[in-house]
Design a protein with these regions (language model features):
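Alpha-helix N-cap and loop-to-helix initiation/capping positions
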Residues: 40-44, 72, 76, 107-115, ...
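Beta/alpha (TIM)-barrel catalytic core signal, keyed to glycine-rich beta->alpha loops juxtaposed to Asp/Glu
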Residues: 2-12, 140-266
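Short, well-ordered coil/turn segments that N-cap beta-strands
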Residues: 23-28, 56-58, 86-92, 129-133, ...
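N-terminal binding-site loop/beta-alpha segment at the start of enzyme catalytic domains
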Residues: 1-92, 158
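A short, structured active-site edge motif that brings together acidic residues
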Residues: 89-102, 193-196
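Short, acidic/polar
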Residues: 39-53, 110-127, 146, 175-179
Length: 266
């Protein structure tokens, strides 16, 4: 039986404009960094997407390298979109990113125009869509002129392959410069994605949070629960089915400290 969205999906969710743009994002988004790779359970992936959308979560956040293996999260989400969610595409905000290593050779990572635009084309193909709503540069590139990376985002938008531009994990100075470049290009730069939780509050002190607020750019957090450390999952040790035990790429046992246990809900 094909999926039909809940008739009450917009009854309780709160939506906020991203910066000064007209795009409204839900208070919670579904990030596909974990759980949607080739090692995941496809039925669980569908259930997560359906439950999210049924509760008004319209924003699905991806990146070219989400997996494992890289690209598999986009492929799996694309399959769900094609098989179950295609009728709701205009109700969804789909975002993806490029910046980390995606393929071998000198053109497979960082921030060159060649890499960013090729990666976006690959992402669109994997997901089976004509455009994404937001295309991010995923990290600062110390070896590519910032103008080149930002012009690639501008090209993505003006070609119709993305509706809005964003950046991720940029420091204050590069955020300021990126904003100036994109403003001059008249490119709709609306969002900055950064790590933010009670374990990592750097944007409150490094100037990024206040600068973006003052200049009409939205902030969206990734890992607000510190990959589960801020839940009750680890209060009694490390479960066998936990991310620390089964994956270990991004979350490690040495991050499970007495402080993290004290900050988790009891």
């Amino acid at each position: 039986m094909s999926y039909t969205a809940s008739n009450t999906r917009y009854a309780t969710m709160t939506y906020h404009r991203s910066g000064n743009s007209g795009l409204k994002l839900p208070a919670l988004s579904l990030g596909l960094w974990h759980n949607f790779g080739s090692n995941g359970n496809y039925e669980n992936m569908k259930a997560m997407c359906f439950t999210a959308f049924d509760h008004g979560i319209t924003h699905f956040d991806l990146a070219n390298n989400y997996g494992p293996e890289p690209g598999s999260a986009e492929r799996n989400f694309g399959r769900i979109l094609r098989e179950e969610l295609h009728a709701y595409r205009d109700e969804l905000v789909i975002s993806t990113k490029a910046g980390y290593t995606m393929w071998d050779g000198p053109y497979g990572d960082w921030g060159s125009r060649k890499y960013l635009l090729a990666s976006l084309d690959q992402s669109l193909k994997r997901m089976g869509v004509d455009y994404v709503d937001i295309f991010y540069h995923h990290r600062m590139d110390p070896n590519t002129p910032l103008e080149e990376s930002m012009m690639a985002l501008d090209t993505a938008v003006k070609s119709g392959k993305a509706l809005y531009a964003g950046i991720s994990r940029y420091d204050l100075e590069h955020t300021r410069q990126a904003m100036e470049i994109l403003k001059e290009l008249k490119c709709p730069f609306i969002i900055h994605q950064t790590r933010y939780s009670i374990f990592d509050r750097h944007i409150e002190t490094d100037g990024v949070k206040s600068f973006t607020a003052q200049n009409g750019c939205g902030i969206i957090a990734f890992s607000p629960l510190a990959q589960g450390l801020l839940t009750d999952k680890y209060l009694k040790g490390i479960p066998e089915d936990s991310r620390i035990k089964t994956d270990g790429r991004f979350l490690h046992a040495d991050q499970l400290t007495p402080e993290s246990s004290r900050r988790s809900p009891h």
